[in-house]
Amino acid sequence: MRASNYHINTLKEAPADAEVASHQLMTRAGMIRKLAGGIYSYMPLGLKVIRKVEHIIREEMNASGAIELLMPVVQPAELWQESGRWEQYGQELLRIKDRHQRDFVLQPTSEEVITDIARNEIHSYRQLPVNFFHIQTKFRDERRPRFGVMRGREFTMKDAYSFDRDEAGAGRSYDIMFDAYHRIFRRLGLAFRAVAADTGSIGGSRSHEFQVIADTGEDLLVFNPDSDYAANIELAEAVSLLTERARPAEALQEVATPGAAKCEAVAELLGLPLSQTVKSIVLATESEKDGVQIWLVLLRGDHELNEVKVGKVPGLQNFRLATEAEIVEHFGCKPGYLGPIATAKPVRIIADRTVANMADFVCGANRPDFHLRGVNWGRDLPEPELVTDLRNVVAGDPSPDGKGTLAIQRGIEVGHVFFLGTKYSEALKATFLDETGKPALMQMGCYGIGVTRIVGAAIEQNFDNRGIIWPRAIAPFEVVICPVGWGKSETVRNKSEALYQALREQGIDVILDDRDARPGVMFAEWELIGVPLRVTIGDRGLNDGVIELQGRRDTETVKISVDSALKEILNKLETL
């Protein structure tokens, strides 16, 4: 490709609404242009990257035995109503009507459609197992689309769905996809982790996320550097350091804490470590049978509540935060000074494991500007109704596998695999006839990869103050040839053309910048775009029989012989 025949339109400044590096750099490099909130046009450079990502995914999916098809973006509401997700999915599901006033959705995912295909196409155990996949546009009506292609409303995903005769077969299909995903992300040139994860709205009983490691990631990944243990922080179990509660050493006393409504302020005022305080979080549930039920969740002052874990507590599946009126009614006090002793009305008390092991702790007195210190279970208040893991782990916590301690890093989710079981096949009655001629439900798995999200995540992991640093496998071009003096020197033009043709013959994706731009402008533009390897050809070097190479991550150029240039470039590419 010649730059003079290609669309390259870089910008000096990023748009004001671009919050993260990938959004800023993709816009400045001319890879995307915003059409509406969370909706982007992919310009030639950006689309080229996407196509390379898709190519790697498609190759590995084919190698794993998956079969490609294509399902529609527009799906009838009846399927979503049949699965129960028409109401469950929430406002992210964009609902539309056709001219006949029939309800449809713009697909955010395709479990319903693929299950409908399976129930109509698969009738016998002889047709199983099978794994279908497609790469398709999706739409989720995000309330606040942000971060460019990282959290857009319209995006591209690869979805695969496996169908098996039994749970054992579904487990094998899951493992095949799990391994295929490792191959995909390794080929993409990304540093990543596969972590155990919550199944979320998709459902199912087994799940792993594939997370690209990046300091700007929204997700917290918990792992053991000394073992294979890794999990999303939502799922990581917090193992209590203490096995036996200490004996009481203080008397219960009420202390004035004027204006200290936060645990941090209370600890500072009383001269105590934050870990000696207990925070009170008031939740509510509603049911036709019991009406509104108020729950008091107790957490150590230096810990954070894990809402996924709370949602798995029996009775708290559909919890919400209690209103201030509900809090005052049940505690006789506004938030900030709440505690489990002497509530105005009965509440259900559940405690994190760490809190249940505490002695002589500090909590709210259910009286404005007062707290209780020297509080002890059994002596000053009954043992909690339920003790369970309710908190996020912190770095240094014991690893759940018993092999050392945990570390935490940030990541960006780019892939997710789920074992679904019969969640959708049962809802949509997707059955097959087994060996005995009896109908049985298909066991399902689903496996997603965010194609456009990978592009953003790759940049978040690979950039500097000059621009993008693409992994070679997905760079828009592998090599850029930058002739210095293109319009003045026939020798420069001839050598540049010869090297350009030689690289093309070797199958290298190369672009020749024949626009006759000034060297500084030319170099800065290609550093912004992020091409992995730059070759500079000028009269001064040619007079000495050399040209210059510089990898995008390199700080210095390397002079190489003109005669061995092709070999040197190919060798350098192998290291990128």
Swiss-Prot record:
<keyword id="KW-0547">Nucleotide-binding</keyword>
<dbReference type="GO" id="GO:0006433">
    <property type="term" value="P:prolyl-tRNA aminoacylation"/>
</dbReference>
<dbReference type="Pfam" id="PF04073">
    <property type="entry name" value="tRNA_edit"/>
</dbReference>
<dbReference type="GO" id="GO:0004827">
    <property type="term" value="F:proline-tRNA ligase activity"/>
</dbReference>
<dbReference type="GO" id="GO:0002161">
    <property type="term" value="F:aminoacyl-tRNA deacylase activity"/>
</dbReference>
<dbReference type="InterPro" id="IPR004154">
    <property type="entry name" value="Anticodon-bd"/>
</dbReference>
<dbReference type="InterPro" id="IPR023717">
    <property type="entry name" value="Pro-tRNA-Synthase_IIa_type1"/>
</dbReference>
<dbReference type="GO" id="GO:0005829">
    <property type="term" value="C:cytosol"/>
</dbReference>
<dbReference type="InterPro" id="IPR036621">
    <property type="entry name" value="Anticodon-bd_dom_sf"/>
</dbReference>
<comment type="subunit">
    <text>Homodimer.</text>
</comment>
<dbReference type="InterPro" id="IPR004500">
    <property type="entry name" value="Pro-tRNA-synth_IIa_bac-type"/>
</dbReference>
<keyword id="KW-0963">Cytoplasm</keyword>
<dbReference type="InterPro" id="IPR050062">
    <property type="entry name" value="Pro-tRNA_synthetase"/>
</dbReference>
<dbReference type="InterPro" id="IPR044140">
    <property type="entry name" value="ProRS_anticodon_short"/>
</dbReference>
<dbReference type="InterPro" id="IPR006195">
    <property type="entry name" value="aa-tRNA-synth_II"/>
</dbReference>
<dbReference type="InterPro" id="IPR007214">
    <property type="entry name" value="YbaK/aa-tRNA-synth-assoc-dom"/>
</dbReference>
<protein>
    <recommendedName>
        <fullName>Proline--tRNA ligase</fullName>
        <ecNumber>6.1.1.15</ecNumber>
    </recommendedName>
</protein>
<dbReference type="InterPro" id="IPR045864">
    <property type="entry name" value="aa-tRNA-synth_II/BPL/LPL"/>
</dbReference>
<dbReference type="InterPro" id="IPR002316">
    <property type="entry name" value="Pro-tRNA-ligase_IIa"/>
</dbReference>
<dbReference type="GO" id="GO:0005524">
    <property type="term" value="F:ATP binding"/>
</dbReference>
<dbReference type="Pfam" id="PF00587">
    <property type="entry name" value="tRNA-synt_2b"/>
</dbReference>
<keyword id="KW-0648">Protein biosynthesis</keyword>
<comment type="function">
    <text>Catalyzes the attachment of proline to tRNA(Pro) in a two-step reaction: proline is first activated by ATP to form Pro-AMP and then transferred to the acceptor end of tRNA(Pro). As ProRS can inadvertently accommodate and process non-cognate amino acids such as alanine and cysteine, to avoid such errors it has two additional distinct editing activities against alanine. One activity is designated as 'pretransfer' editing and involves the tRNA(Pro)-independent hydrolysis of activated Ala-AMP.</text>
</comment>
<keyword id="KW-0436">Ligase</keyword>
<dbReference type="Pfam" id="PF03129">
    <property type="entry name" value="HGTP_anticodon"/>
</dbReference>
<keyword id="KW-0030">Aminoacyl-tRNA synthetase</keyword>
<dbReference type="InterPro" id="IPR033730">
    <property type="entry name" value="ProRS_core_prok"/>
</dbReference>
<dbReference type="InterPro" id="IPR002314">
    <property type="entry name" value="aa-tRNA-synt_IIb"/>
</dbReference>
<keyword id="KW-0067">ATP-binding</keyword>
<comment type="similarity">
    <text>Belongs to the class-II aminoacyl-tRNA synthetase family. ProS type 1 subfamily.</text>
</comment>
<dbReference type="InterPro" id="IPR036754">
    <property type="entry name" value="YbaK/aa-tRNA-synt-asso_dom_sf"/>
</dbReference>
